[in-house]
Regions:
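Conserved N-terminal/central alpha/beta ligand/cofactor-binding core
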Residues: 30, 35-132
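Core beta-strand elements of the Rossmann-like FAD/NAD(P) dinucleotide-binding domain
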Residues: 2-5
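N-terminal Rossmann-like FAD-binding beta1-loop-alpha1 element of flavoenzymes
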Residues: 7-33
């Protein structure tokens, strides 16, 4: 049987899965996801820690996050790529929440942010002990 798709996503990591969800949400066509292993075996599932994003502009900002990322990468990282990733991270978090990711919250109902290696501010979001 021949199946027709408008989009083909290869791999089951967060980048491919996010793209597939965005295309599906936009109603742009049928999406096929092809992967050689189970979802649990993708590198994204093996990542440790959480997801870094500026979420509170009162105490954090993109400039600080970019600086932290460049330092952590020993200034070898492509500055333009780092800036793009950092500045798009908040929208990525909003998308993940829209798709059902339930990040940990504090008593006030705000994201329960953590500060982990290489970060000067509390900007790491988690879901229990599952994110990375």
């Amino acid at each position: 049987m021949i199946r027709k798709f408008d989009f083909l996503v290869i791999g089951s990591g967060v980048a491919g899965m996010s793209y597939a969800l965005k295309v599906a949400d936009a109603g742009k066509g049928k999406v096929a996801i092809v992967c050689k292993t189970t979802l649990e075996e993708a590198n994204t599932a093996k990542a440790q820690g959480g997801i870094a994003s500026v979420t509170n502009m009162e105490v954090d900002n993109f400039k600080k996050h970019i600086k932290d990322t460049m330092i952590a990468g020993d200034f070898i990282s492509d500055p333009a790529a780092v800036e793009q990733v950092v500045k798009n991270a908040p929208q990525g978090i909003r998308d993940l929440v829209k798709w059902g990711v339930n990040f940990d919250k504090n008593e006030k109902g705000d994201f329960d942010l953590h500060r982990e290696g290489g970060h000067s501010e509390f900007r790491i979001l988690h879901h229990a002990d599952d994110t990375g």
